[in-house]
From Swiss-Prot:
InterPro entries documented for this protein: Azurin, BlueCu_1, Cu-binding_ET, Cupredoxin
SUPFAM superfamilies named in the record: Cupredoxins
Native source organism of the sequence: Pseudomonas aeruginosa
Keyword set includes Metal-binding: yes
Gene Ontology molecular function, alphabetical: copper ion binding; electron transfer activity
Described function: Transfers electrons from cytochrome c551 to cytochrome oxidase.
Cited Gene3D superfamilies: Cupredoxins - blue copper proteins
Protein name: Azurin
């Protein structure tokens, strides 16, 4: 099974994938995020954040209030299953999480918490 995915977040405010499938035979799953664009993170920063679909809006709202210096994430937010740091042009970050944190049948969303980005930069994550 493929237990990782490479995701790009660009200057057009888009991820290059909006559906991720995690094979339940994977013990851990890794997301490798890169930013191929030209804009710095204070203008067009991207992160990759995972929560349940039900928790997504709260994570985004509280993240915006937390500000750029906190990567637009509420510190130690228990609703966040996994997240990368916020990156800008030419930067990369990865996150690995335990697949045991996911439940079959639950709806998960991955998204960017930079203000205004989650409307476009979001997708599903499914355990199969």
């Amino acid at each position: 099974a493929e237990c990782s995915v490479d995701i790009q977040g660009n200057d057009q405010m888009q991820f290059n994938t909006n559906a991720i499938t995690v094979d339940k035979s994977c013990k851990q799953f890794t997301v490798n995020l890169s930013h191929p664009g030209n804009l710095p993170k204070n203008v067009m920063g991207h992160n990759w954040v995972l929560s349940t679909a039900a928790d997504m809006q709260g994570v985004v709202t509280d993240g915006m209030a937390s500000g750029l210096d906190k990567d637009y994430l509420k510190p130690d937010d228990s609703r966040v299953i996994a997240h990368t740091k916020l990156i800008g042009s030419g930067e990369k970050d990865s996150v690995t999480f335990d697949v045991s944190k996911l439940k079959e049948g639950e709806q998960y969303m991955s998204f960017c918490t930079f203000p205004g980005h989650s409307a476009l930069m979001k997708g599903t994550l499914t355990l199969k």
